[in-house]
Amino acid sequence: MQRRYFAAYRNKKLENKDFTIISNNCWAGMIYESYNLPKMSPTIGSFFMPDDYLRFCKDIRRYLTLELSFIEPYESKYANKLSGNERFGTYPIGLLGDVEIMFLHYHTADEAKVKWERRCGRINWDKTIYKFNDQNGCTPANVIDFFSLPIDHKLFFTIHKEWPKINDDGFYIIEQKANANEITTSHEPFGSNRYFDLTKMINML
């Protein structure tokens, strides 16, 4: 509620309003809503497993030329890992080459594909932020790989204070009382707060 209530105020602080966020989870959509902006990212309403997200980001332009297809939940290479979640099997799973995309907030594959293709056409490659976090079995090794990617404007959020701070620029430890294993999307920062100033980062793109 707070995220959307102050959206108009945050929007006035923005100088760049045509940015793209490539996120490993639903954070991108939350950010566009928090600024009351059109969604300029295909990763809205979906999530990637860590290895697939890193693979996708490393060669994103090639992956986005591939035809998005869909598989049954039992065909997912992550079926055993995700089957314990009650929502597994209720959402479409997309496939771009060897990368799986979990379209968590979509009801059908057709809906997911239409919005994916439409938003791919909105990507602003000159103003792109890549956001990763500690969800879905992410390890410190994954974080090292993320900050080693040949891309600019990287953000990483974690609740793990014991993890080594891989990078002084873009690595943020977030306090969270609930769920001690990984950060929840609702706890990831937006706007300007005590962790960092996203508005400032966007304006500097």
Model-derived regions, located:
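Adenosine ribonucleotide-centric catalytic and binding domains
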Residues: I22-N80
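Acidic/glycine-enriched edge-of-secondary-structure segments
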Residues: E86-E111, W125-K127, K131
